Amino acid sequence: MEITTLQIVLVFIVACIAGMGSILDEFQFHRPLIACTLVGIVLGDMKTGIIIGGTLEMIALGWMNIGAAVAPDAALASIISTILVIAGHQSIGAGIALAIPLAAAGQVLTIIVRTITVAFQHAADKAADNGNLTAISWIHVSSLFLQAMRVAIPAVIVALSVGTSEVQNMLNAIPEVVTNGLNIAGGMIVVVGYAMVINMMRAGYLMPFFYLGFVTAAFTNFNLVALGVIGTVMAVLYIQLSPKYNRVAGAPAQAAGNNDLDNELD
């Protein structure tokens, strides 16, 4: 697939937004489900972008920046893996498997850029001492621009080179045993990521519903909409029938009416 100039510009814009979003953590544009979908729309294959994004999202659910700890770069992994799958004609499994080392490489880039922006912090301190609010604003924007370029530059390089004959020949020269291994590894990574998320979020009293969902999906022909409706109905019934949530509103008032002091006053 040959990527046009307009598509490269749009990929650059999406990559900039994702790069800034991975630092701001506010609008979640760096999440795989959003970033991959946007790249898929730009490259004309939104369906593949959604599939890659949904799969990567299951892996990256626990990836987040906490304090000084830098998480793997989901934005860089999402954008480049989507470009390789759609424009480079790689399989989705191979793209998922390649996303993990890409995320690790992006993590290193994030640490490097954050180290560089330390100088910006000192410059902002000096501007604050001088009362120069305009300089502080420009320093913040400049440091955020570096974070945007951290994702945008590698994404544009891949987008420019993935359609060339040299890169295509290199990708096609990968042995079949390696591509099959990447596909298998991609499936295993998704399972492991999903298991890690369940292990962190599991609630023992809700696990029967979890197993029931797997059995229902395996032995019926229901689509995702039907399964979602069934799950919603069961959740509502559980809340209505559970003693934890189903408390009589008049019980406290009745208990107050049986107070000995009230009886004496009567």
UniProtKB/Swiss-Prot annotation:
Q: What induces it?
A: Expression of the manXYZ operon is positively regulated by the cAMP-CRP complex and negatively regulated by the Mlc transcriptional repressor. Expression is also weakly repressed by NagC.
- All residue ranges annotated as the PTS EIIC type-4 domain in the record: 3-237
Substituting residue 65 to P results in: Significantly impairs the mannose transport capacity
**Subcellular locations according to the entry:** Cell inner membrane
Name the domain of life: Bacteria
Topological type in the membrane: Multi-pass membrane protein
Parts of the chain on the Periplasmic side: 1-4, 44-46, 87-90, 161-176, 219-224
Under the GO molecular function aspect, what terms does this record hold?
Answer: protein-N(PI)-phosphohistidine-mannose phosphotransferase system transporter activity
Signal peptide location = none
Q: Classify the main location.
A: membrane
| Cytoplasmic topological domain | 125-132, 201-207, 243-266
Q: Which residues lie within the membrane without crossing it?
A: 5-43, 47-86
For this UniProt record, the keywords arranged alphabetically read as follows: Cell inner membrane, Cell membrane, Formylation, Membrane, Phosphotransferase system, Sugar transport, Transmembrane, Transmembrane helix, Transport
Q: What PROSITE patterns does the database record attribute to this sequence? A: PTS_EIIC_TYPE_4 (PS51106)
The record lists the membrane-crossing segments as: 91-124, 133-160, 177-200, 208-218, 225-242
Any one annotated GO CC term: transmembrane transporter complex
> Domain text from the record?
The PTS EIIC type-4 domain forms the PTS system translocation channel and contains the specific substrate-binding site.
Q: How does it assemble?
A: Homotrimer of protomers that are composed of two subunits, IIC and IID.
As for what it does, the entry says: The phosphoenolpyruvate-dependent sugar phosphotransferase system (sugar PTS), a major carbohydrate active transport system, catalyzes the phosphorylation of incoming sugar substrates concomitantly with their translocation across the cell membrane. The enzyme II ManXYZ PTS system is involved in mannose transport. Also functions as a receptor for bacterial chemotaxis and is required for infection of the cell by bacteriophage lambda where it most likely functions as a pore for penetration of lambda DNA.
What is the protein's given name? Answer: PTS system mannose-specific EIIC component
Taxon lineage: Bacteria, Pseudomonadati, Pseudomonadota, Gammaproteobacteria, Enterobacterales
